[in-house]
From Swiss-Prot:
Organism, as annotated: Candida maltosa
Cofactor or coenzyme needed: heme
One Pfam family from the record: p450
Record-listed heme binding positions: 471
Protein name: Cytochrome P450 52A3-B
Family indicated by similarity: Belongs to the cytochrome P450 family.
Domain of life per record: Eukaryota
Function: Together with an NADPH cytochrome P450 the enzyme system catalyzes the terminal hydroxylation as the first step in the assimilation of alkanes and fatty acids.
Entries under InterPro entries matching the protein: Cyt_P450, Cyt_P450_CS, Cyt_P450_E_CYP52_ascomycetes, Cyt_P450_E_CYP52_fungi, Cyt_P450_E_grp-II, Cyt_P450_sf
GO molecular function: heme binding; iron ion binding; oxidoreductase activity, acting on paired donors, with incorporation or reduction of molecular oxygen, reduced flavin or flavoprotein as one donor, and incorporation of one atom of oxygen
Length: 523
């Protein structure tokens, strides 16, 4: 066949739109691949192993992740997956162009969060979270984040001591709810989530939604707060969808059902009610509110009167102040109920410091005196080690950069991270690495925190993140959890776990909690 005839037959296909589109896409992907290879060579980088089940386009890998999340098994799926990669890192690509590096290496986590902080940002998190959380400290980067942090930092610097006294009325209601079960099995986690929404709304808004009040107690819940009865459930549902949007990466926009939009509206309705109430208050009313006890919203109103800013920051703090503390309390009591020796040892320390039962000296419990309870601190450290509030997180590269190690056959080479790529770090697995925590890394053992091996963990223990974006409210959460556990230890001598599954399935939204609830009996 003559060359002219071949050209004559092929040429019409070369001018078709789909051929041009395919050629352009192929050229684009090839140019990206060649560019990345060039910089890998120039920077003496090597890729870690490729994620075996991701496939070339990465979609199968994302589907597996979402399935595991929906089944309550994402944390353990990640744990088991990293066991297949001895150098603690691997990577995948999505749609042939987005590189995702997954790591549990403390040195890589340190680079992302601290030493190379300016090389990474939240990436698409704002788009993922915007429908519920808007422009707040957890969704913003750059100057917006710096402004938010500067605005919020003072709110957590001056509140700790008075905070424990404000908890006691809510603890009393919590205890009444527990005692209603008369030693029978009940879901303690469900009560903790109601408890923390009550304490968080009082701290943030100046009024509690009193979700622990119900007909069983003979105390009717308040009905003067619009949207109060729907708030907690709507907040939970919205976070479920936000998590799915996050794990969907660039396909987040596909998760936007009517239920999600309706729940966001319900959450915003309650927040707007409190914001408008604060903005409508006179200066004398604001001053009077402050005298009656610290109120986050009324302090924030002194800095800005923008209702959108107030709403967004309040909801951002609500995620941290409510969900992380509820998860920490739930997992701590889950393990304490399974380990009576640990529970009894903890009660002995609390008896020495504050008394038990009818001899409990509640007035002596404060921010300062709680810090003296070393075993209580070890119990919380161990809970956060095994069940970190945010077990999986990610950052996006703002420029071409590298991670210090994990590449190549021996895992010692740096990894090239192109601009726009994501680094997913899984502290849930980091906290279980044998080289840092020993052969019993999967065992709940608070005593490890008195051993020399845990004094130099560095970035192998990051329950509250690290670097410039370290959690502002970590001491606030630890103080609240310490107070609640202390008071429960004073009131209940015997705990018994009724959960049959171990390790437990874990629900990961924006934070982590027990997937099925924490079922115990308490006497």
């Amino acid at each position: 066949m003559a060359i002219e005839q071949i050209i004559e037959e092929v040429l019409p296909y070369l001018t078709k739109w789909y051929t041009i589109l395919f050629g352009a896409a192929f050229t684009y992907f090839l140019s990206i691949a060649l560019r990345n290879k060039y910089y890998e060579y120039k920077l003496k980088c090597e890729n870690p192993p490729y994620f075996k089940t991701a496939g070339f386009v990465g979609i199968p890998g994302l589907i597996d992740v979402i399935k595991a999340k929906n089944a309550g098994k994402l944390a353990d799926y990640a744990d088991q997956t990293f066991d297949e990669y001895p150098h603690h890192s691997f990577y995948m690509t999505v749609a042939g162009m987005l590189k995702i590096v997954l790591t549990v290496d403390p040195e890589n986590i340190k680079a992302v969060l601290a030493t190379q902080f300016n090389d990474f940002a939240l990436g698409a998190r704002h788009a993922h979270f915007d429908p519920l959380l808007g422009d707040g400290i957890f969704t913003l980067d750059g100057e917006g984040w710096k402004h938010s942090r500067a605005m919020l930092r003072p709110q957590f610097a001056r509140e700790q001591i008075a905070h424990v006294k404000a908890l006691e009325p809510h603890v009393q209601v919590l205890a009444k709810q527990i005692k209603l079960n008369k030693g029978e099995t009940f879901d303690l986690q469900e009560l903790f989530f109601r408890f923390t929404v009550d304490t968080a709304t009082e701290f943030l808004f100046g009024e509690s939604v009193h979700s622990l009040y119900d007909e069983k107690l003979g105390v009717p819940p308040p009905n003067n707060i619009p949207g109060r009865e729907n708030f907690a459930k709507a907040f939970n549902t919205s976070q479920h969808y936000l998590a799915t949007r996050t794990y969907s990466q660039m396909f987040y926009f596909l998760t936007n059902p009517k239920e999600f939009r309706d729940c966001n509206a319900k959450v915003h309705k309650l927040a707007q009610y409190f914001v408008n109430k604060a903005l409508d208050a006179s200066e004398d009313e604001v001053a009077e509110k402050s005298k009656g006890g610290y109120v986050f919203l009324y302090e924030l109103v002194k800095q800005t009167r923008d209702p959108k800013v107030l709403q967004d920051q309040l909801l951002n703090i609500m995620v941290a102040g409510r969900d992380t503390t509820a998860g920490l309390l739930s997992f701590a009591m889950f393990e304490l109920a399974r380990n009576p020796k640990i529970w009894n040892k903890l009660r002995e320390e609390i008896e020495v410091n504050f008394g038990l039962g009818e001899e409990a000296r509640v007035d002596e419990i404060s921010f300062e005196t709680l810090k003296k309870c070393e075993y209580l601190k070890a119990v919380l450290n161990e809970t956060l080690r095994m069940y970190p509030s945010v077990p999986v997180n990610f950052r996006t590269a703002t420029r071409d950069t590298t991670l210090p190690r994990g590449g190549g056959k021996d895992g010692t080479s740096p990894i090239f991270v192109p601009k726009g790529s994501s680094v997913v770090y899984t502290v849930y697995k980091t906290h279980r690495l044998e080289e840092y925590y020993g052969k019993d890394a999967y065992e709940f053992r608070p005593e490890r925190w008195f051993e020399p091996s845990t004094r130099k963990l560095g970035w192998a223990y990051v329950p509250f993140n690290g670097g410039p974006r370290i959690c502002l409210g970590q001491q606030f959460a630890l103080t609240e959890a310490s107070y609640v556990i202390t008071r429960l230890a004073q009131m209940f001598e015997h705990l018994e776990s009724k959960d049959e599954t171990y390790p437990p399935n874990k629900c990961i939204h924006l934070t982590m909690n027990h997937n099925e609830g924490v079922f115990i009996s308490a006497k």
